[in-house]
């Protein structure tokens, strides 16, 4: 292995970039649907050795010195995001005549842009690089900053954050009940990269001991938490039905199919409970499951009232229209409705974080001013964003915290209001992406929100994956991808919050400060030894 490390260190130019690309591609195997945890313990040591091989000319300026580490980081990131996001092209094949031209932008262009974040990570690390275990701290710091930025820069896209690779199953998710994802991102990189010290690093014992301690604590806390009794359901118990209709996206876009789609949802809602279980108190439909503007269709509300039993509540994804007034065109929102057994809409919540290029076109006015109005006109979407995400209170007092579609991937946006809720609600339509890794990755990220908040989650997805998840991230019931049917169960209870949002933020900044100090002292000492 030492010989292999030496060969990687000596690589340069295209060969170095290609190995970086392969290392990033390998790291994807640690994410769903593969969950091969060990892959990250190979890819990150390779990245360390590639950075070890950077030997800039002392006469070069600062910019030229950073080109090599930037190229390494970008190639690693490009491989990682290309391997993890290629399935986005499927969404553009649904209406291929209109959007096939954009497939290269989604499949290659987006990974190329996201690779810049990992280029920044490696540049930061290289600035604090040394020959000891401090360089592992520097790499963890760099990735911690990069992943934090990826969560909000240009509207944010923290999909497949490195930390998720360290949490492939509920046993390994429990640390998220104490620290936030940003902290886990940093510590995961430290642990993943630590094996590089075995063959190429001074002070290996210290670095490896810290990595082993972190990994052991991560696993031990998981065993401890899962060994505790499952949180009991709050009284009175609430029976939940989750509907997964499995409707092809092309069919959903066909206006002629609207009535049959609506009736399909109603038939699943009315299906008898298997095994003589309790009749559902709440029925949940996926995102945009109501295929028309509900407020313009009183007959549809009447049909819902016919199907719902006394006291039942329907929570359904729908497009909501709002009159803008003054002769302006209506505004449309991707929403969740709460509908009672009389067919009355008694609550609604609109999506706050819209999908760029899917639900709206970023910088549309700027593109139009540049003469690119044809591009703006060809893009899908046209939704407006809500300013806040309310907690929906149901009859009886139960409270839902709604997250529509990919809002569930933004861990930092699940605010203090979520702690007021009794259940997290995630409705989505992943039919756009087909039977690919995308829906599995999406589900895995949503599952973590239950662990972070200590609140159970109801997830309704058109084609899957639908589930009821308890407050520890354990699956109570699940319907896999493309399985049509319903889930009937009793809503699990909440768990006490171990740390609040401000405390987790402080832990993140403290961890970043510690890594900065370790890396800086290691670098400072390294420079003294060189001189």
Swiss-Prot record:
InterPro entries from the UniProt entry: Apolipo_AcylTrfase (IPR004563), C-N_Hydrolase (IPR003010), C-N_Hydrolase_sf (IPR036526), LNT_N (IPR045378)
What domain of life does the native source organism fall in?
Bacteria
TM region(s), chain numbering: 8-28, 34-54, 69-89, 105-125, 136-156, 178-198, 207-227, 507-527
**Pathway listed:** Protein modification; lipoprotein biosynthesis (N-acyl transfer)
Membrane topology is:
Multi-pass membrane protein
Q: Which UniProt keywords apply?
A: Acyltransferase, Cell inner membrane, Cell membrane, Membrane, Transferase, Transmembrane, Transmembrane helix
Provide the protein's localization: Cell inner membrane
GO molecular function terms listed in the Swiss-Prot or TrEMBL record: N-acyltransferase activity
Give a GO cellular-component term: plasma membrane
- Which EC class is this protein assigned? transferase
One BP term from GO: lipoprotein biosynthetic process
Q: Which residues form the CN hydrolase domain?
A: 243-493
The active site consists of 287, 351, 405
Enzyme Commission code(s) on record: 2.3.1.269
| Family the entry assigns | Belongs to the CN hydrolase family. Apolipoprotein N-acyltransferase subfamily.
* Role, per record: Catalyzes the phospholipid dependent N-acylation of the N-terminal cysteine of apolipoprotein, the last step in lipoprotein maturation.
Protein name per the record: Apolipoprotein N-acyltransferase
* Record organism: Sinorhizobium medicae (strain WSM419)
